[in-house]
Structure formats: C-alpha cells, structure tokens
C-alpha cells in the first residue's frame, strides 16, 4: 500500500466521495478525477455537470487530494452514444450504463490512469473483487443487496479487475452516507442520480426525438386488431404500461394495456391486457456478445442464476454455450418482459460470471 497510487473516478455523488475518503484513510496516494462524458448544448440541462464538478472539487479539497478533470465526450459519442442510437433505431432497448463502464470508465479512463502513473483505478460502484483459488479475480456482488451494481460491470475482464478497487463494495449505503456526514463531505445528502448520465432526469422521449426521427404507426392487440396509434416503436419497451395511450377500447374490459412485442417490419406495436398476460412471459432467451469475467464460460452447459434486468431477484436457469459463442438460456420459471437489447447477467451465489446482450 505504501505510496501505491490510486486514481478515483469522482462523479460529484456520495458513493465516489466516500470511496476517495476511505482510500486516503487507508494510506494510498489518491487523486480524484472527474470524467465529463457529455457536451451539453447551452439550452440543455441534461447533466447538472457544473454542480457535479463543483461538488467533486469540494470533496477533493476537503479530503486533501489533487483534483483533475478529463473530457471523454468524443470517446463517449463514438463508442457509447452512437451504439445506443443504432440499437434504438433497430427497435431494441440498450443499456448505455453497461457500455459506459466497458468503453469509458474501464477502458478510456484506465488508459488515462496509466498515463498519470496510477497503480489502481477506483470507483464508487457497489461491487467487490475476490481472489479465487486458481489465482483469478472474481467479480462479487456488493454487500448491500439493494445497491449491488455487478449487473452493470459484467463486461470487466481479469486485466481490468486486477487494477480496480471498489472501496465501498463491502459497506451498506446508509453507512456510506453516515461516513460522508461524519467527515463533512458536501455530498452527504445529495440525491442519487437516476437515469442515463446524458439524459439525467429529463424526459426520455423528448431527448430521443432530437436524434432519431420517429415513425408513427398502429398499435394492435394480439389478434391483429387496431386499438390505437404509437409515436414511434423506439419509445416503447417490452412490458411498458405508461404512455401507450390506449383506453376505452370497444368491447374490452377496463384493464391496463402493456407493450408485448414490436413488429419492426410493419411498424406495429403489439399490446396485451393485464400485467400477467401470457404473451409478456418467456421461458428462454438467446444472448450474443458474451463477456466472461474469468475469460471463458464455466462449461459448455451449466446451471446458475441470472438477471434479465437490474435489481431483479436471481432466477435459476440452465445456460448452453453455442459454437459461435452465443448462449441459449432456459429458465426454471417463465420470465416477464425479457427485452431485446438489455443484458442477461449470470451468477453462482454472489459471484458474477459474466453476461451478454439479449436478442
């Protein structure tokens, strides 16, 4: 630890603030770096970046560590945002936070850390690393089950994990805020950020329409009968209830409608009635673009648990690895609203094995 240099990604939130503080207390040579990943227009308030930068600076000053800023907006646009738009255009629902970790925080930022002569990178993620018996590094769930973020980190490999520290991975969120308050960090009561970093709290539809032309179309029920109009397939995700604008359909009970399927060829959204309608459930899925934390799948066929969305309870399943590296996943119980473009992430107990993108 003596003089080991750690570069912490400081976002201006409480988690990264406390991460930096703990590392300093543990005797590391710590530098805080704020990553700016998005260029706002003057009229936009997407990310409250100015406030975040000010908070990040204040935290570093308070802890007594150097503060730097780095702009990754070009890398973010090329490697995260353009992919995000392509996916939406294709009718899928991508997860840019996963891609941001892969391309920016643990790639572009890691390269920058090497330039600064850093030994380790640290972030405020709720995750842990553990050395396995065979010498490999495991990605392990954060202690606070409600906050565990391994779902967003499954693309990390051995080389990245060996150079990464997650200082708050073994602490409960409430304790993190307590530590921040005790140490007079300005971020102690700052609200957790929600949503995608470049959209922030703003209305998603309004944001997306700036970049992709929407093509309106019909909404059909499962029998092909027109029951309404949609504003553009990209605005809807499987299982969605809000914003469908279907109501008072003749000869139908007043039961909520849910988006069940996208017919891209005909630009039709298929909707069904009832939260538990059979068309919203599937027992299997296929995933591509697999990342395995250990560098390879545990076996050609294995049982484990999986999540098809963040914060979902682990679901028992069987995974079969195909010749082309894709996987077929069969769940013990049917799963609601499996969404193409989102990720399926695999676990054995508290160890994250990796994951892939649902097709």
Swiss-Prot record:
Highest taxon, organism lineage: Bacteria
Principal EC category: transferase
A Pfam family reported for this protein in Swiss-Prot or TrEMBL: tRNA_Me_trans_M
SUPFAM superfamilies registered for this protein in UniProt: Adenine nucleotide alpha hydrolases-like
Chain spans, region Interaction with tRNA: 147-149, 309-310
Gene Ontology terms for molecular function: ATP binding; tRNA binding; tRNA-uridine 2-sulfurtransferase activity
Residue ranges, annotated region (Interaction with target base in tRNA): 95-97
Disulfide bonding pattern of the chain: 100-197
Keywords: ATP-binding, Cytoplasm, Disulfide bond, Nucleotide-binding, RNA-binding, Transferase, tRNA processing, tRNA-binding
Binding site for ATP: 9-16, 35, 124
Cellular component terms (Gene Ontology): cytoplasm
Subcellular location(s) of the protein: Cytoplasm
Interaction with tRNA (site feature) positions: 125, 342
Reactions the enzyme catalyzes: S-sulfanyl-L-cysteinyl-[protein] + uridine(34) in tRNA + AH2 + ATP = 2-thiouridine(34) in tRNA + L-cysteinyl-[protein] + A + AMP + diphosphate + H(+)
Transcription regulation keyword on record: no
Main location: cytoplasm
Record EC number: 2.8.1.13
Active site, UniProt feature: 100 (nucleophile), 197 (cysteine persulfide intermediate)
InterPro entries: MnmA-like (IPR004506), MnmA-like_C (IPR046885), MnmA-like_central (IPR046884), MnmA-like_central_sf (IPR023382), Rossmann-like_a/b/a_fold (IPR014729)
Gene3D superfamilies on file: Adenine nucleotide alpha hydrolases-like domains, HUPs, Translation factors
Keyword presence, NAD: no
GO BP: any one term: tRNA wobble position uridine thiolation
General function of this protein: Catalyzes the 2-thiolation of uridine at the wobble position (U34) of tRNA, leading to the formation of s(2)U34.
Family: Belongs to the MnmA/TRMU family.
Protein's name in the database: tRNA-specific 2-thiouridylase MnmA
Organism this protein belongs to: Francisella tularensis subsp. tularensis (strain SCHU S4 / Schu 4)
Biological classification of the source: Bacteria, Pseudomonadati, Pseudomonadota, Gammaproteobacteria, Thiotrichales
Gene: mnmA
